[in-house]
From Swiss-Prot:
Catalytic activity: D-serine = pyruvate + NH4(+)
Homology family: Belongs to the DSD1 family.
Notes on how activity is controlled: Inhibited by hydroxylamine and aminooxyacetate.
A Pfam family matched in the record: Ala_racemase_N
Listed name of the protein: D-serine dehydratase
Domain of life: Eukaryota
Tissue specificity note: Expressed in kidney, specifically in the proximal tubule epithelial cells (at protein level). Expressed in the liver, specifically in hepatocytes (at protein level). Low expression levels in cerebellum, brain stem, midbrain and cerebrum (at protein level). In the cerebellum, expressed in Bergmann glial cells and astrocytes (at protein level). In the cerebrum, expressed in astrocytes (at protein level).
EC number: 4.3.1.18
CDD domains assigned: PLPDE_III_DSD (cd06817)
Naturally occurring in which organism (per UniProt): Gallus gallus (Chicken)
Chain positions found as N6-(pyridoxal phosphate)lysine: 45
InterPro entries per UniProt: Ala_racemase_N, D-amino_acid_metab_enzyme, D-ser_dehydrat-like_dom, D-ser_dehydrat-like_sf, PLP-binding_barrel
Activity's dependence on pH: Optimum pH is 8.5 (at 37 degrees Celsius).
Role description: Catalyzes the conversion of D-serine, an allosteric activator of the N-methyl-D-aspartate (NMDA) receptor for L-glutamate, to pyruvate and ammonia.
Length: 376
């Protein structure tokens, strides 16, 4: 019922996506990968939609990374294939993984411990299928993965490749340079990207020297892939995800310019409180998330108000937000009750996860509704 609607008529809070900007972001990342001569495997966890997946893959429906089994099933149902679960293989849900592996031409899993490999071997796929395994490397991010300098990493890769080749195949190595999210500017982002790339390439070289074939080498994060370095051309693929929308955090990091941010959360003014100098709006943390509130930032770190740098977000409860003038008197006449403001969220992935529908717009009108998958 909302197709063709003007944005200021939408029920709020409403998550909106500028179609032109998202298309431009997707094409720019594809072009970066083409220029490097590497494959783009877009991570779809930011949007979790078939439409976003089509946009990111250029319509091929092949070669994506997902963060949950629910996403994997959803995209498989939507005709996607060559799906990588970018999460250490959940051995408690191995039957679900096996079902996807049998169903798809290529369903890839990550592992970083021998016990996970043993679980895969205890659950052979049969029917001529093999588990497609990537070794997860930790090149400084400090989350999942084995350190490439640890001798156990080489031993695990050798075991994946050699212990049961009729059941398990080593596809490649996978590293997420999430430590780029602690950067401020292209130079520091590229320094981490270079360290990660070199660590991955050195590990692949060590594998090959040991007689272990390693066809694929993949790294990713939106900051690193937004400022690619020449060394990345020696990899086989990149796997960023947030870039399709970008967000306030990415502009602060230096990954993008403000005009590259496609996502907004529309909110209505629902109250004036002159004695406090505050506007009340109908967007709380349930429509925005609390990402960005850390490091002493408080609510103002969670979002910026588009077109109104004089306003700041000072309070967030579940369904309410409070705005103040950053350095003077609030002009309530400029923001009557019922007027609509647009918030630029700090973290698009977290904010998008709060909404059941995205209103995609062009020239001020809704042109599509995207419905994301939810759950795990």
């Amino acid at each position: 019922m909302w197709l063709g609607a003007l944005l200021d008529t939408l029920p709020t809070p409403a998550l909106t996506i500028d179609r032109t900007t998202a298309h431009r972001n997707a094409e720019r990342m594809r072009e970066r990968c083409r220029a490097l001569g590497v494959r783009l495997r877009p991570h779809v966890k930011t949007h979790k939609t078939l439409e976003g997946g089509l946009l990111a893959t250029g319509g091929t429906r092949r070669g994506i990374a997902v963060s949950t089994l629910a996403e994997a099933r959803f995209f498989a149902d939507g005709g996607f294939d060559d799906i990588l679960l970018a999460y250490p293989v959940p051995t408690a849900r191995l039957e679900e993984c096996a079902g996807l592996a049998r169903r798809l031409d290529a369903f890839h899993v990550l592992l970083d411990r021998p016990e996970a490999l043993a679980s895969l071997r205890q659950r052979p796929l049969g029917h001529g299928k093999r588990w497609l395994v990537w070794l997860k490397l930790d090149c400084g991010n400090g989350r999942a993965g084995v350190r490439p300098t640890d001798p156990a990493a080489l031993e695990l890769a050798q075991a994946i490749a050699n212990d049961a080749p009729e059941e398990v195949t080593l596809v490649g190595v996978y590293a997420h340079c999430g430590n780029t999210y602690g950067c401020s500017g292209a130079d520091t982002i590229q320094a981490i990207a270079r360290t990660t790339t070199n660590a991955v390439l050195s590990f692949v070289a060590a594998l090959r020297q040991a007689g272990v074939p390693c066809p694929q080498a993949s790294i990713g994060s939106t900051p690193s892939c937004s400022h690619p370095i020449p060394e990345m051309s020696q990899l086989t693929e990149l796997h960023p995800g947030n870039y399709i929308f970008y967000d306030l955090q990415q502009t602060q990091l230096g990954s993008c310019q403000p005009q590259d941010v496609a996502i907004r959360v529309l909110t209505r003014v629902i109250g004036h409180y002159a004695h406090r100098g505050q506007l009340l709006v109908d967007c709380g943390w349930a429509a925005l998330s609390l990402h960005g509130a850390g490091a002493g930032q408080g609510p103002q770190g969670c979002a910026a108000i588009d077109g109104h740098p004089e306003l700041r977000l000072v309070g967030l409860t579940q369904e309410h937000g409070l705005l103040e003038h950053a350095g003077g008197q609030m002009d309530f006449g400029r923001f009557p009750v019922g007027s609509v403001l647009a918030l630029i969220p700090y973290h698009a992935c977290a904010t998008a996860a709060m909404h059941p529908v995205y209103y995609v717009h062009e020239e001020g009108k809704v042109v599509a509704l995207w419905h994301p998958v939810r759950g795990w």
